[in-house]
């Protein structure tokens, strides 16, 4: 080991089993979505899977007001269980809203459990959701809930008619059958979330932003000006809510364009589903084009959508729309707003556009390509540790508790987004981690992509490993 604490021999860069376990935890876990009509027991099932009371459970349809995700562990397997949100149903809009929920789930989850009340049987809404899920190509499991009697057992058997295979008879309230259901699900659930695994086909783009910011206008401009909406690409299954558009000589998949085109107020629950669809579009995308109204001050809504994007870890392009309405005074104010409000996303490329006039819209394509290239980037372990050695020698970590922590070793655990794990002898202050991120960007680029830095505290090989922080 060198004096500054980094490893000098490349043989020391090989990871032991404990290190590999740390790296596995850095990879995004697969997502299991729990979907179904209101009051069929979705949140009760989530709580049963988690082994603790997390999801709000009341005997009132629509009590879940948003899509909520929880980290879960079953027989040593990590995964994320997603409690899809409820709504205030009415007789007219119920079927459409259940279908909407299933549509979001099938694009953002790696597997789906459809929960049906066995004592009621398959309703029209249940069957509509089943049809959508069958088209998704994702693993789908049917949970026949509220099976607490012999009669309910017989009722569950009638659900074979839904075409989803064997109905798994469960009682989320009492735990019956849930373990067997999970064992079956985990056999089909991938080890890592598919959203971050390399795959073929067009790159996935989400246009997001607050209402009336110009998402639909931009989509129409991109599709209409190019005269190149693609309906059939070999080997590609297209979700009805997506659009394939050729831009810059390649085909891009714009996710959830049906959500952009639908008129506000067309169905009950639209305000709730505006939020759900935004989250769903971000989760389904690889790169997010975040539209901001350049002619108006930044709002809380802008910042909420921005938080969703950062949390999801997607590549990002900031599109300042309505630039045709911006005068010199507004430009000065906007620059100050960006410096003050968007400090956490300075790494995103900014493109000033007008969806209405078409100004600079073509510049979005190279910005998206740059962001995706950064998002996909992997730094080999050798160059990464050589870089760490130079940085630490010039600027060591600050002393903490009378001791100076040393960075022993660094590796990139995953791409999409680039996630780095630093093995250290002590905790690194948040300020020093931000410093390392800045230096990473200066050296390796990463324009348009978030970077995640995780710290694992350990001693030199052969020493007792302290707890993680």
Curated annotation (Swiss-Prot):
Q: Which organism is it from?
A: Mycobacterium marinum (strain ATCC BAA-535 / M)
InterPro entries referenced in this protein's UniProt entry, alphabetically: AAA+_ATPase, G_ENGA, GTP-bd, GTPase_Der, KH_dom-like, KH_dom-like_a/b, P-loop_NTPase, Small_GTP-bd
Q: What is this protein called?
A: GTPase Der
Matching entries from NCBIfam families are given as:
GTPase_EngA (TIGR03594), PRK03003.1 (NF002828), small_GTP (TIGR00231)
Q: How does it assemble?
A: Associates with the 50S ribosomal subunit.
Identify its protein family. Belongs to the TRAFAC class TrmE-Era-EngA-EngB-Septin-like GTPase superfamily. EngA (Der) GTPase family.
Which GO biological process entries does UniProt record here? ribosome biogenesis
Residue ranges of the EngA-type G domain? 30-193, 203-376
Q: What does the protein in this record do?
A: GTPase that plays an essential role in the late steps of ribosome biogenesis.
**Positions contributing to GTP 1 binding:** 36-43, 83-87, 145-148
- Establish whether keyword Ribonucleoprotein is in the entry: no
Which parts of the sequence belong to the KH-like domain? Answer: 377-459
Keywords assigned by UniProt, alphabetized: GTP-binding, Nucleotide-binding, Repeat, Ribosome biogenesis
Tell me which PROSITE patterns the record gives. Answer: G_ENGA
Tell me one Pfam family matched here.
MMR_HSR1
Report the GO molecular function annotations. Answer: ATP hydrolysis activity; GTP binding; ribosome binding
Q: Binding of GTP 2: at which residues?
A: 209-216, 256-260, 321-324
Encoding gene (name) = der
- Record bears the keyword Disulfide bond: no
